[in-house]
Amino acid sequence: MQYDERYTPYIEMTGLLPFIQLVSRSTPNLNVAAVTALIDRWRPETHSFHLRTGEMIVTLQDVSMITALPIEGKPLCMSTDSEGWRQQMEALIGMPPPEPEVEDGGKKDRVPADAPFTWIAANFAHCPEDSNDEVIQTYARVYMWYVISRTIFADGTGKNAPWMWLKALTVFDNKFSWGSAALAYLYRQLDDACRRSTKDGGVGGCMLLLSIWSWERLPVGRPKTSKWNTWDDNGNPVRLPTWAYKWDVVSEVASKVNLLYKQYTNKMDSLTAEQVEWQPYCAGPNFGDAHTFELNPICL
C-alpha cells in the first residue's frame, strides 16, 4: 500500500500523521532474538520486564517520543460486537470482503470480523487520479486501517485487519488517545506471548516501539546505525521525524537466531545498572547520533 499525498489532511485530523509518516518509510530491521530474550523477562503480574537491575517498562513518554502518537484525548474503547459488521463496512468503504466458501455438507465456522490484508491491498492500493473528495476520504480511511492493523495493533499473524479498527476511523476528528491504546495493546500482547497462549507462540503489538525502546535503554542486541535516509517533512512541522529517526537504517543481524538468543539471554542475566541508559531522551551526545535533526514537536 503506497502513501498518497491526497490522504494527508484526513490522516492529520486523526492525529496519526507523524506515525504514518514514520512507518510509511522503511523501518529498521527487527532483531527477533533480542526481542525474544527481552519478552522472556516480561511478567504479566506486574506488566513489567524483570531484569537484574530491577523492573523496567515501556511508558507513555516512550510512546510519545518514539511514535508521536497522541497520548492525550478520548480513550479508544471499541465494542467487539461484530453483529452486522459486513453491512457497516460496506456503508463505510463501499464493500466488505467476500464470505469464505463452504464446501457442500460442510459446517460453516464463525467468521471473524476482519478483512485479509491481501484483499485490502487488491482493492484499495491505488486511489484513482480523478477521484472526488468522498472517494479520497474512503481510500485514506482504508489506508490508515491497513497501516495501524499491521503496526500498532498487529496480532502476530500478519494476515487480517480487524473491523473494529476501521470502525474507529469512521470519524476522522475523534481526538482519540492512540498512544494509550498502542501501549495497552502492547502490554496485552506481551502478556499473551510470555504465557505462550497463542498457537504460534508469536507476539503482536508495535514491535517498532518495543525495539527502539530496548535499543535506547539496553546494550543487548543494540545494532549500529549505518545511515539516515533523507526525511521529507513537506514543510509541515507535524511531519518532522520522531526519536525513532535515530535508528533509521541499522546493521543487519548475521548470526543464527538460536545462537544469538542464547547470547542475548546471558547478557540479560549479567546486565548491570551502569549499562542501562535510564534517561535516553535528553540533549547531548545521544541526540547527536542522528546528525542533529529537528524533532517532531508532538514528541516534546
What do the PLM-derived regions correspond to, one by one?
Residues 1-300:
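Structural stabilizers in ordered domains
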